[in-house]
Amino acid sequence: MSQYDHNQSAGANPPPPMSTCTSPPPPIGYPTNQPSHGSVAQGKVETKSKGDGFFKGCLAAMCCCCALDICF
């Protein structure tokens, strides 16, 4: 009998303990699907499209650069 066999237990390994850890709550004001303690049920949150203002601004900047390059 080897030393390895001597150190092994005869019974089955017990299952690992169940973890009671939960994730931290979301930041204040962050919309969730679950109502919090004592909160009033709110309607569905709708998002609004911000449009393509970023792309229009980039195109305007490129046009200005090209116009300045041509003029000077």
Swiss-Prot record:
Composition skew (Pro residues), residue ranges: 13-29
Quaternary data: Heterodimers. Binds weakly to CYSTM7 and WIH1/CYSTM13.
Protein name in UniProt: Protein CYSTEINE-RICH TRANSMEMBRANE MODULE 1
Record's bilayer topology term: Single-pass membrane protein
One of the record's GO cellular component terms: plasma membrane
Native organism taxonomy: Eukaryota, Viridiplantae, Streptophyta, Embryophyta, Tracheophyta
Chief localization: membrane
Entries under Pfam families matching the protein: CYSTM
Membrane-spanning ranges: 49-65
Induction (free text): Induced by drought and oxidation stress.
Organism: Arabidopsis thaliana
Role, per record: May be involved in aluminium (Al) tolerance. Involved in resistance to abiotic stress.
InterPro entries in the cross-refs: CYSTM_dom (IPR028144), WIH1-like (IPR044850)
Compartments, record wording: Cell membrane; Nucleus
Keywords, alphabetical: Cell membrane, Membrane, Nucleus, Transmembrane, Transmembrane helix
Region of interest called Disordered, as start-end residue ranges on this chain: 1-46
